[in-house]
Each structure stands twice: as structure tokens, then as C-alpha cells.
């Protein structure tokens, strides 16, 4: 052999490392391990609050005592567990799992489908000995067998004195559809992580805003962010039970353009969000933004109310209002909810009175009227362009799973002199297939 021939043969031989790599990533055990890792980290992303502030993680995941003995806020932030679904290692797991599925599809599923379609007739009786289910009959003919199999849903092929029949080829296509569907789901998840964003806003009733408080955004999320429109909170209110418990809270939202013109409008509540141009606004929390008051005959003033630290004894909002022009005296206003009751304390911290909205009380020589409590709505804002792709993948996945349950059954028959040979095999539902073959043989004997 010449040097040029050797060189040519080396060029035409696939690299050994390439084939070994494909064999490795196509290994079912590797795919299962990757799937388990993805499931574990996905669960961690559900259990651990995503996209919260540093102070939140410091308060809930302190260094002493550490959760499970190791999970502190430092470890959590170092590993990226505060934004699991967009970390490089999570996306790498998805890509590796997708590569494993692709390799498995081309190495196993497609060849299996090709083998199922490239059938051949049995020409010799000894070929039936390889089948787990076969019989040799003294009676029977291809002409009588053909209608029996066609009634059972088989597609029959004849050639001289040989017969081949099959049904359930869709069962071989099903696993390929399942693999393709999972790849589509992975692609949707990756695309969503790269192009989506997550934001939070706390907006007072009557105010307008554009999405600015971005908690988390993918590197390609620029086109997903709202640019030429914003949101106006027309009204926020809470429904209370007779016992004073919160039943539901609502936000009447309008989508407005840059000129303030209304484009869309919807009243949202928990689990009933507003959707606009791929961005979803969820009702998640509430607060008290301020209180409107009037001192004597002054214009109505809106004072901001701040959430106070109650050491775990529930939420309270408070503000201070001067009762003298030189600000030397004033009163504190406290409230727990939007039911309209305000508690008034004097400068010494003594309880003065409890006032309802619309009521006027004399205090420190002035008439103080509580006009209205102003609520604020907590909105969670998300955009995930990968969701439609994921939904498509799940639809195909369900279809592929159903297709995979169909048994791929094959039957061969041979007319050889005064002998008739019949046999078959299936990839699942073996008992049902055996009954089908036995029934077919019994019917052949009767003809």
C-alpha cells in the first residue's frame, strides 16, 4: 500500500474520539442522570425564592444556623440559586441533555424505524425457527390468511408463496416524536431564559408607570421590554370577609401609549393576570401608599404612609401630620388595612381616637378629616417568549407518548408444498399478540 493510499484511508475513516464521544452522549444512563439533575435543580428553583433582594436572602438564609448545615445566603448567591433557570450551568445541562437526545435519536430511534420499514419475505421454513411465536400447519393458504389479517388491521404484502404483514408502525414513530418534542421543550426553555425578563412594581392607586424595576433579564431580552407603552393603575381595592379577613384583591389596569391613550384595560386578581404583547402582569401583593387628609379648610393633602416594623405582629402602616404651621406639634396616623379605620396618636404616643374614612375629629385645636386611604398594588411582571415553544413541545410530547403505546406487530407466512408456516413478533403487548396469532391459526384450520 502506498503512502497516498494510506493517507486517503485515514481521511475517509471517522476519528475514533468523535465516535466515542457520540456513543457516550447517546448513552441512556447519561440521559437519565442529566434528566435527574435538571429535575433536582428545577425543584430547587421552585423551592428557593427567585429574584429576591440581597436583604431577603440574608434574612431567610442566615449563616448561623445554615439551612441543611450548608445552605447560606453566600452559598446560594455563589451558585446562582437565586436565578437558577438562567445560570450558565443550568443552561449547559439543558444543552447537554438535548445533545444526548439528538444523538440517541440518530443512533437508535431512526435506525429502528428504518429497520421496521425495510422488511423482507421469509423464503425458507428454517427462518421461522428464529421467531418466538411460530407454527407449522398442514392446512392453510395465503389466500385465506390475507383477509383474516386485513380484518385485524394489518397491511399485507404478497410475493409468490410468501406473505408479510405489519401493523402499528406508528409505534416506531412515537419515540422519535417524543425525542423531538423534548428537544423543542428544551429549546423553548433556553430561548425563554435568554430573551425573557422578570420585574416587580409597587404602584399607588391612580399612578402610571413603565416597567423599570427589572429583577432579572436575559442577555437577549432587549426586544421583550416594553418601550412604547406603560400601565396605569386606575383603582386598587380589597374585598374583605365579615370577619375582616382578605378574600381577594383587585387592580383595575389600563395599558396606555406614550401619549396616555388607553390601548387595553382589564381588572386583574390573583391567578387572573393581564397579558399584552407577550408581557404578563400578575397580582401578587398589596400595600398602603398613603392617606388623603384635610386640615380645617385646607386643600386635600396626600401623605405617604410607610410600613412599620412590628416585630412579627402583622403589618402596620403609619405617617405623621403636623397640626401647627411651624411643625412643632402633630399626630401620628396608623392603619392595618384598607377597611377605612385609622388610629390617631398624639405627640406623647397616647391613643386619641379611631377614625373612619370621611370623619372629622378635633385635635390640637384643628379639625382633621380623614378623606381616603390610598392603596398600592404589588405587580409581578414577566415576559417569556419561550412559552409558546414549550407548549408546542408538550403537545407533541403527549401525541408522541400516545403513539408509542401502539404495538408494532409483524407476521410472516410461507406456503411450501403441503406445509404452511406462520409466525410473528411484536415489541409490546405480547400476551395480546399471542392470542391474536392463536385465533388466526384456529380460523385457518377451519378453512
UniProtKB/Swiss-Prot annotation:
Q: Enumerate the InterPro entries for this protein.
A: Cyt_c_bgen_Ccs1/CcsB/ResB (IPR023494), ResB-like_domain (IPR007816)
Q: What is its main location?
A: membrane
Keywords on record: Cytochrome c-type biogenesis, Membrane, Thylakoid, Transmembrane, Transmembrane helix
Kindly give the membrane topology term recorded for this protein: Multi-pass membrane protein
Cellular location(s): Cellular thylakoid membrane
Which parts pass through the membrane?
A: 28-48, 87-107, 173-193
An example of a Pfam family matching this protein is ResB
Entry keyword annotation includes Heme: no
Q: Which GO terms describe its biological process?
A: cytochrome complex assembly
Q: What GO CC terms are in its UniProt record?
A: plasma membrane-derived thylakoid membrane
Q: Does the keyword Lipid metabolism apply?
A: no
Give the record's subunit note. May interact with CcsA.
Query: Could you tell me what this protein does?
Result: Required during biogenesis of c-type cytochromes (cytochrome c6 and cytochrome f) at the step of heme attachment.
Per the record, the similarity remark reads:
Belongs to the Ccs1/CcsB family.
Record PANTHER family: CYTOCHROME C BIOGENESIS PROTEIN CCS1, CHLOROPLASTIC
- For this entry, the protein name equals Cytochrome c biogenesis protein CcsB
Q: What would be the name of the gene that encodes this protein?
A: ccsB
Amino acid at each position: 500500500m502506498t503512502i497516498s493510499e494510506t493517507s486517503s484511508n485515514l481521511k475517509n475513516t471517522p476519528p475514533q474520539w468523535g465516535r466515542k464521544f457520540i456513543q457516550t452522549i447517546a448513552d441512556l444512563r447519561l440521559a437519565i442522570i442529566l434528566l435527574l439533575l435538571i429535575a433536582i435543580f428545577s425543584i430547587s428553583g421552585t423551592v428557593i425564592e427567585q429574584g429576591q433582594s440581597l436583604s431577603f436572602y440574608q434574612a431567610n438564609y442566615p449563616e448561623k444556623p445554615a439551612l441543611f448545615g450548608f445552605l447560606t445566603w453566600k452559598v446560594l448567591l455563589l451558585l446562582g440559586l437565586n436565578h437558577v433557570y438562567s445560570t450558565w450551568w443550568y443552561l449547559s445541562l439543558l444543552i447537554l441533555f438535548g445533545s444526548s437526545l439528538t444523538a440517541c435519536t440518530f443512533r437508535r430511534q431512526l435506525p429502528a424505524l428504518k429497520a421496521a420499514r425495510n422488511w423482507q419475505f421469509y423464503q425458507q421454513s428454517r427462518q421461522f425457527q428464529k421467531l418466538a411465536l411460530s407454527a407449522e400447519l398442514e392446512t392453510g393458504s395465503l389466500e385465506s390468511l390475507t383477509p383474516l389479517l386485513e380484518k385485524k388491521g394489518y397491511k399485507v404484502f404478497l410475493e409468490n408463496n410468501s406473505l408479510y404483514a405489519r401493523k402499528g408502525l406508528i409505534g416506531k414513530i412515537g419515540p422519535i416524536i417524543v425525542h423531538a418534542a423534548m428537544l423543542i421543550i428544551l429549546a423553548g426553555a433556553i430561548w425563554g431564559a435568554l430573551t425573557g425578563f422578570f420585574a416587580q412594581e409597587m404602584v399607588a392607586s391612580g399612578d402610571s408607570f413603565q416597567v423599570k424595576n427589572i429583577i432579572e433579564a436575559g442577555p437577549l431580552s432587549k426586544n421583550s421590554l416594553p418601550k412604547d407603552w406603560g400601565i396605569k393603575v386606575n383603582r386598587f381595592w380589597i374585598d374583605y370577609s365579615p370577619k375582616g379577613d382578605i378574600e381577594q384583591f383587585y387592580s383595575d389596569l389600563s395599558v396606555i401609549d406614550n401619549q396616555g391613550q388607553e390601548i387595553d384595560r382589564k381588572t386583574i386578581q390573583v391567578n387572573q393576570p393581564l397579558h399584552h404583547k407577550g408581557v404578563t402582569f400578575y397580582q401578587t401583593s398589596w400595600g398602603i401608599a398613603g392617606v388623603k387628609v384635610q386640615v380645617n379648610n385646607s386643600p386635600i393633602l396626600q401623605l405617604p404612609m410607610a410600613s412599620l416594623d412590628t416585630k412579627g405582629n402583622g403589618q402596620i402602616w403609619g405617617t405623621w401630620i403636623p397640626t401647627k404651621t411651624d411643625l412643632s406639634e402633630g399626630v401620628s396616623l396608623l392603619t392595618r388595612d384598607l377597611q377605612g379605620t385609622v388610629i390617631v396618636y398624639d405627640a406623647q404616643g397616647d391613643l386619641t381616637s379611631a377614625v373612619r374614612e370621611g370623619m372629622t375629629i378635633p385635635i390640637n385645636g384643628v379639625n382633621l378629616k380623614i378623606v381616603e386611604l390610598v392603596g398600592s398594588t404589588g405587580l409581578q411582571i414577566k415576559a417569556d417568549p419561550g412559552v409558546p415553544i414549550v407548549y408546542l413541545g408538550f403537545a407533541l410530547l403527549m401525541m408522541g407518548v400516545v403513539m408509542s403505546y401502539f404495538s408494532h406487530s409483524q407476521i410472516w407466512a410461507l406456503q411450501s408444498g403441503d406445509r404452511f408456516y406462520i409466525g410473528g413478533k411484536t415489541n409490546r403487548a405480547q400476551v395480546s399478540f399471542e392470542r391474536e396469532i392463536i385465533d388466526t391459526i384456529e380460523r385457518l384450520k377451519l378453512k
